[in-house]
């Protein structure tokens, strides 16, 4: 692969304020420099912040592409997230502040969480679940989802969380691939005022899941206290959570788990092919997420921290559950949609609980931009002090909007790059020391080594190329469940003869200051007249125009240029699609990054096809632009969007 052309230049910079720097955990480059000199030593030292039942003897064994961290050590994830806080001054500190979509609220102190997790762990044991057994968790965003994860960890069972929005087929495939013994689900969940029939979906899936012996059902929807009429229960197999809880002891002894014992398996959403069961281990994963939570968000004892991600994604695992709770944080958890019952729901929650750290996705930020600032201005967001972005690269203009309208120019923005496979944040600013640039994830986290390479593994010092991680890290995936060869082929075979190089599948560019800019999946790179252009740059140029809320670009076949650029655009409130605006946007891109990147086609749309985790599905947009039959749409949040786009595009072409 040739290098990726770098077209978009960003010169705006934002250093941390002296006031923020003075109070930050990391306020100079000493930590980063020490970690760069000795990454293993850095992670070894950070692992000491955890409570170990048996101290580890060897920090790292590395036989590429296989890493083992903290060999000889034993620990328990639930002890690190709960017990150690209960036995200290955080006993009565709020651990979890939960708000349901209908407006119901529950708060759990660390002591409350401790009691609930012990009871849940004993429920699992009563149903025959033990160390090494797999438990599927198919729940809405309710506290029992967190409790179930920690209960599994307490007894050494391996949890695999399945996003509550997935259809029965997706649930079935994940249960069967992992060989789950127990399913934990709910009678339903709330989404935009409608009840999602989780138990009914689960029953459909379980018709083809021979490994499931028992089902534990949480009562979420009810017309009155104790109303069990919403779910059909199968005698002998299905058990109500609230009933079983009354039948078990209050204390459950935590299992001593080896550092390399599996903590959980999480399936990537699998937009193509069979979903991959990413395997994460106890000691390394906990070390990675606890350390990155503390330093990336500058997490302090008094913070109220809200990661808006669903529990079904890695961000929910790492930065709603394990990372913050290992640090003894107060976490906000919300069940519903950001625009229900109105478009200010997020800001209402931020104001109500005095949220100080907000971690959300670019797709949400672009939606807020599209809706306008009137919803933000209704609320006092002055408690916010750190803003985070996760899930995909953030366009510079969305970054600036976030900085101005949510952060009031006062809050550092940590634009984080990482993956399900990496387990924890890999590239990010540190808010007390890093000068940020809109759209750049900046530099690797301390203890992480990255490089920009060409197709022959030659290192590039500036410009565009392939992102590689060149050194093992504690929270890295260990394998793909049941398919170790796929692990090697997918992540460690990009550069033949170099099994030490992890390839995440992303292109990136390095600027003159050594900052990294993620250009998107290498599969999405455009090839226009021999020039390789990252989709991110063209999309950012479009979003830079005041009329555009969100944009996605793909390549389509062109007889002369190889590929032409097709853009799909949603407009901000107050703007109307027209031929003149289409021409204006094409000229704007040409002016911003060059005539080479001028889109050939622009289609205005009310929405873009996205996965349930909010990522734009460019594969389907390519199908539309090329006039092909649509590929697999099962992971779409709203399949009607892509059908409507296809009709629109075909009408415009004709």
Curated annotation (Swiss-Prot):
InterPro entries attached to this UniProt entry: Ac_CoA_lig (IPR011904), ACAS_N (IPR032387), AMP-bd_C (IPR025110), AMP-bd_C_sf (IPR045851), AMP-binding_CS (IPR020845), AMP-dep_synth/lig_dom (IPR000873), ANL_N_sf (IPR042099)
Binding, Mg(2+): 543, 545, 548
Entry comment on modification after translation: Acetylated. Deacetylation by the SIR2-homolog deacetylase activates the enzyme.
CDD domains found in the cross-reference section: ACS
UniProt record similarity statement: Belongs to the ATP-dependent AMP-binding enzyme family.
Role, per record: Catalyzes the conversion of acetate into acetyl-CoA (AcCoA), an essential intermediate at the junction of anabolic and catabolic pathways. AcsA undergoes a two-step reaction. In the first half reaction, AcsA combines acetate with ATP to form acetyl-adenylate (AcAMP) intermediate. In the second half reaction, it can then transfer the acetyl group from AcAMP to the sulfhydryl group of CoA, forming the product AcCoA.
Protein name (Swiss-Prot/TrEMBL): Acetyl-coenzyme A synthetase
């Amino acid at each position: 692969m040739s290098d990726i052309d770098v077209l978009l230049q960003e010169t705006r910079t934002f250093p941390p304020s002296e006031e923020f720097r003075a109070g930050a955990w990391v306020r100079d480059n000493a930590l980063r420099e020490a970690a760069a000199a000795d990454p293993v030593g850095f992670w070894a030292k950070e692992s000491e912040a955890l409570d170990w039942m048996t101290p580890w003897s060897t920090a790292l064994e590395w036989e590429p592409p296989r890493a083992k961290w903290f060999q000889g050590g034993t620990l328990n994830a639930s002890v690190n997230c709960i017990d150690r806080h209960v036995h200290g001054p955080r006993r009565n500190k709020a651990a979890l502040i939960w708000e349901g979509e209908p407006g119901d609220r529950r708060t759990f102190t660390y002591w409350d969480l401790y009691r609930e997790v012990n009871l849940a762990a004993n429920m699992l044991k009563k149903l025959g679940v033990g160390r090494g057994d797999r438990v599927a968790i198919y729940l809405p965003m309710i506290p029992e989802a967190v409790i179930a994860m920690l209960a599994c960890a307490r007894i050494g069972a391996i949890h695999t969380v399945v996003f509550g929005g997935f259809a029965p087929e997706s649930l079935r495939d994940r249960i069967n691939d992992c060989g789950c013994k127990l399913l934990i689900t709910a009678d339903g969940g709330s989404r935009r005022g409608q009840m999602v029939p989780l138990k009914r979906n689960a029953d459909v899936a379980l018709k083809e899941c021979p490994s499931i012996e028992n089902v534990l059902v949480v009562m979420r929807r009810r017309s009155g206290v104790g109303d069990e009429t919403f779910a059909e229960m199968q005698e002998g197999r299905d058990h109500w959570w609230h009933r079983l809880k009354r039948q078990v002891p209050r204390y459950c002894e935590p299992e001593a788990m080896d550092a390399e014992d599996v903590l959980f398996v999480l399936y990537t959403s699998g937009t193509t092919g069979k979903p991959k069961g990413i395997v994460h281990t106890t000691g390394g994963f906990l070390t990675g997420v606890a350390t990155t939570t503390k330093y990336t968000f500058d997490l302090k004892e008094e913070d109220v921290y809200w990661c808006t991600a669903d529990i079904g994604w890695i961000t929910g695992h790492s930065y709603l559950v394990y990372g913050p709770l290992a640090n003894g944080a107060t976490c906000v958890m919300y069940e519903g949609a950001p625009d229900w019952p109105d478009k200010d729901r997020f800001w209402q929650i931020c104001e109500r609980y005095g949220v100080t750290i907000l971690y959300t996705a670019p797709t949400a930020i672009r939606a807020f931009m599209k809706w306008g600032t009137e919803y933000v201005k209704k609320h006092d967001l002055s408690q916010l002090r750190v803003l985070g972005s996760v899930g995909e690269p953030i366009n510079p203009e969305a970054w600036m909007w976030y900085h101005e309208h949510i952060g009031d120019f006062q809050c550092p923005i940590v634009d984080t790059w990482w993956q399900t496979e990496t387990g924890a944040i890999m590239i990010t600013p540190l808010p007390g020391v890093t000068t940020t640039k809109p759209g750049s994830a900046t530099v690797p986290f301390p203890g992480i080594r990255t490089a920009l390479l060409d197709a022959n593994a030659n290192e590039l010092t500036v410009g565009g190329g392939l992102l590689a991680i060149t050194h093992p890290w504690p929270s890295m995936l260990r394998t793909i469940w049941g398919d170790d060869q796929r692990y090697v082929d997918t992540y460690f075979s990009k550069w033949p003869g170099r099994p030490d190089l992890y390839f995440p599948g992303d292109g990136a560019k390095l600027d003159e200051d050594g900052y990294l800019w993620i250009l998107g999946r290498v599969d999405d790179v455009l090839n226009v007249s021999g020039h390789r252009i990252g989709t991110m740059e063209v999309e950012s140029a479009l979003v830079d125009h005041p009329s555009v809320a969100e944009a996605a670009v793909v390549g389509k076949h062109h007889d002369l240029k190889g590929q032409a650029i097709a853009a799909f655009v949603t407009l901000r409130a107050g703007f109307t699609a027209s031929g003149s605006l289409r021409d204006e946007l094409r000229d704007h891109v040409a002016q911003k990054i060059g005539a080479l990147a001028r889109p050939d086609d622009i289609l205005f749309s009310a929405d873009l096809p996205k996965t349930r985790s909010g990522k734009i599905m460019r594969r389907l947009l390519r199908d539309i632009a090329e006039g092909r039959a649509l590929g697999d749409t099962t992971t779409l949040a709203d399949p009607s969007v892509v059908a409507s786009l296809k009709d629109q595009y075909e009408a415009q072409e004709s």
